[in-house]
Amino acid sequence: MCKADAIELNTYALATDKRQTSAEMEQQLLDLVAAVTAAVKVPVAVKLSQWFTSLPHLVGQLEEAGARGVVLFNRFYQPDFDIETLEVRPTLHFSKPSELLPRLHWAAILYGHVNLDVAITGGVHSPKTC
């Protein structure tokens, strides 16, 4: 039997309904986090997109919902579409060192204002990157 030390929720929601507000989308995420943290005994971290309107506020709400950590930031895979074959082509673009700065920026903003762990993913390619 496998035992996890923690769970990372890697979520993604695409806003396609013009009637759905950003607050409603965030509430769906908060409800998911609350449900998962209530169902498991291990810490739960949430990997976030950098496109939330008020990231510090959302992170505070995630903490209240039971999250023990956040991961900055999710990188979304964007498939290409071949117009000749009308097929989706998967593409994988690795992170670049230039992606580190916004992650560090937001980690610094959150530092000292939240009581959960903050992790950064992407953008580090060598010890010199930092």
Protein language model regions, located:
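Alpha/beta enzyme core
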Residues: 1-121, 125-130
